Every structure is written in structure tokens, then in C-alpha cells.
Amino acid sequence: MSKVKTRFAPSPTGYLHLGNARTAIFSYLFARHNNGGFVLRIEDTDPERSKKEYEEMLIEDLKWLGIDWDEFYRQSERFDIYREYVNKLLESGHAYPCFCTPEELEKEREEARKKGIPYRYSGKCRHLTPEEVEKFKKEGKPFAIRFKVPENRTVVFEDLIKGHIAINTDDFGDFVIVRSDGSPTYNFVVVVDDALMGITHVIRGEDHIPNTPKQILIYEALGFPVPKFAHLPVILGEDRSKLSKRHGAVSVRAYREEGYMPEALFNYLCLLGWSPPEEGREIFSKEELIKIFDLKDVNDSPAVFNKEKLKWMNGVYIREVLPLDVLLERAIPFLEKAGYDTSDREYIKKVLEYTRDSFDTLSEMVDRLRPFFVDEFEIPEELWSFLDDEKAYQVLSAFLEKIREKKPETPQEVKKLAKEIQKALKVKPPQVWKPLRIALTGELEGVGIDILIAVLPKEKIEKRILRVLEKLS
């Protein structure tokens, strides 16, 4: 058997969709698991919809996910190759020029609609004589090129996920392989490219199943070996409809911008439709996935995308999996974008060390860590009622005095100091912690106040407490 080779072939017409990202991941893992080759091919034959900026973002997002490739192609740079193979099909009688106008074709479609039957081309131009073809060309009539589909033939293939699939050619009829503007169509170029690039396994979404018999016929007509096909089940939203924008963020880019970790997204997408051999385990590194991934473990039924599950998994990566230095490097751009001072890396590293278990994404981190970076904040009117009593004033004054003597440097030392103040002033724990939290953060809830006091520089704590004491006195 030849060396395994797979490909991912996105169109640069928008952001990288999560479903397409999963296809890329499965194709990549299958190739790497089998010590095979992986190809990235940009399918940009449609000049109207293909955009260079989308191509650049696709490449960035794939690299961000940790996917690398051995070969790279753009279909727009391969038109000469496609022309050569179109001519081969014309010469062998497997294709013919079609001079039908858009109006004539629309009339055929309308008749099919009236009869309530699926549309298939009538084959009107299939039997034109060479003289008629020549005459129409001389008259300057625009023409497409259609593939001549054998009538009433059942095309059969064994899908590696879906099993036995049989589709009759009468279901689709002769189809266009080159448009009247000279641009080749998807079903044609994909065959030429997959054959010339030596693709052994075509792994893609199940929405491509209707294309497969057409492509098999082209493989046969050109004398190319037919690759194996694996059609992945669709990804659904939690309402069991196809995953789309109405389910919220559906692109890799959106999750990048929300502060998701590439390793977590890669890991989670891999589990959509694939069952790891080790039951009950969900966290896998890319290297582990390469070792254990097999198409035989891909389910036939649709997978449901659960954003909360992804968020949980992302939190696990932030808390337990990623080295602190990696988390630091990824956190910096988010903190900078929020306008926080990031000049003291050691300070930020200490903040993250103590707080990484309190957020699941880096966008959550920005809100969570505000008290570590923002000194000027308003205390809401309704929170002053917690401060405006004698005990709160005494607690804040005692705390200020103590930290001027010696600032606690760990959460444990902060808790010890709070207990001493509680005992000395004969108050309950909330009467110590609540005034401190409000004075230092302007909030009733948030990151552990013992952590904030341990990490925040002494002069910042003094400044925040003094501001409240001055207002209370």
C-alpha cells in the first residue's frame, strides 16, 4: 500500500469554521498517526468569493491550532494543469461543450419544480455533432463544459465511516466541469488535484457524499486510482440543528479572540465524533492524539457542540496543563489590550500563579484581574453602607497600621493577620473581609482578597485604604 497522504482543502471565503477545523484536525491526525503526508490546498477557483485576507487568516488559525503541513498549493495557480485534463476528457469523449443559455437552463429547472422532481440536466447538448459545435463556437456562443455521465449506472463505494454507499447516476445527470467564463468547478479540480498530489484518503464532511459518485466517475475517466473516502458526521448545536451563527461563535478566530487555548480547542474538536480508546479520559495532548487516533473510532452519528464543555476544558488547560510561562506569554496581549501595565513580567507571573484557577478564558481573566492593575475606581453608592460604620473604620485602620509594619507576602500570612484583627476588635470574619474587599476592589465579589493583598504592592494597598478612610472620617 502507498504511503498515507491526506489533505485539508478550505475555500478562503470566510473565517475557519469549527466544523472545517475539525475536518483539518482529523485529516492531520490520521496522516501523522500513519507516518504519512499532509497537504494544505487553498481552493480559490471562485474569484468572486475568494479573498486573500481570508486565506491569510485560515493559515494563521491552522498554525495557531498546532497544525503543520508538508505541501502547500493554491488552485488559482494550477489552471494550466486543469485545462490539460479538461482537454483529455474532451478528446476521450467523456466531456462535451454545452451551449445552453442560463435562461434555457432556468426553464428546465422550472419544469422540474412544477413536476416536483429533482432537477437534472436534459442532456440537450450531449448529442451535438462536431459540425454543430464548430458552428456555435464560430458564432461566438458562450459555452460550459459538461462531464458525460454514464446513464443508469450505480456508483458504489465503501466509506470508512458511513459504510456501503450506492448512488445511481440518473439522480444527477451530466454536470458542469468548466463554467462558461472558463473557470473549472469544484468536482473537477478536486479530482485532478487529489490524484496528482497522491492523496490516498479523502476525509471531509458528510455534505460531500453527493459529490463523491461524480468524482469517482472523473477518476475513472482520467485513469486515476480512486482514493478511500471518509465522510465525517455533521456537528450540531445544542438544539440539534446544524451548527451555525445562531448558536453563537462558530469560527476558530472568535474563540482565539475570546482567549481560548489552541491546545484546548484542538482537544475538544477532536472529541466531536471520535471516541478515544481509553474510556472516561478527555484531556489529551496533540502528541498523544497522534498516537491513538484512528478513523475506525469515528462515530457515524452527529456530534453536539457544547460551548460550556469547551469552556470547562479550556479552564483545565489554564489551571493544570499549561506551563506558567506559556500562560504568561498568552495573557500579556489580552492585558495590554485592556490598557493594563504589563512592564513588570514577574509581577504578572505571580498574579497568574495565584489566580489561574479563577477564570476559564483569557477574556474572563481580564475582568477577574482588574483589581491587580487598576488603582482608580469608583466604589458604588450601595457598597458604602458596608463601610459606613465604626467597626469597618477600625478594621481598615488596624489593617493599614499592620501592613505598614510588615506586609504579608502570602495568602496564608494575610489570613493570619485577618484573624489577629478579628480577635483584637472582637468582630466576625465577614466584618474583616468585606470592608477590605470593597476598599481594595470596589466590588463585593471577585478574586480571593487574601491573594490580592499578598500580591499587590504595599503602596497600592495603602493608597486604596487611605482613600476610603479619608472619605469616612
From Swiss-Prot:
A GO biological-process term: glutamyl-tRNA aminoacylation
This protein's UniProt keywords: Aminoacyl-tRNA synthetase, ATP-binding, Cytoplasm, Ligase, Metal-binding, Nucleotide-binding, Protein biosynthesis, Zinc
Domain of life the protein comes from: Bacteria
Annotated localization: Cytoplasm
Residue window of motif 'KMSKS' region: 242-246
Catalytic activity field: tRNA(Glu) + L-glutamate + ATP = L-glutamyl-tRNA(Glu) + AMP + diphosphate
Swiss-Prot/TrEMBL cofactor(s): Zn(2+)
Chief location of this protein within or outside the cell: cytoplasm
PANTHER family: GLUTAMATE--TRNA LIGASE, GLUTAMATE--TRNA LIGASE, MITOCHONDRIAL-RELATED
Subunit structure: Monomer.
Function: Catalyzes the attachment of glutamate to tRNA(Glu) in a two-step reaction: glutamate is first activated by ATP to form Glu-AMP and then transferred to the acceptor end of tRNA(Glu).
Protein name: Glutamate--tRNA ligase
Organism: Aquifex aeolicus (strain VF5)
Upper taxonomic lineage: Bacteria, Pseudomonadati, Aquificota, Aquificia, Aquificales
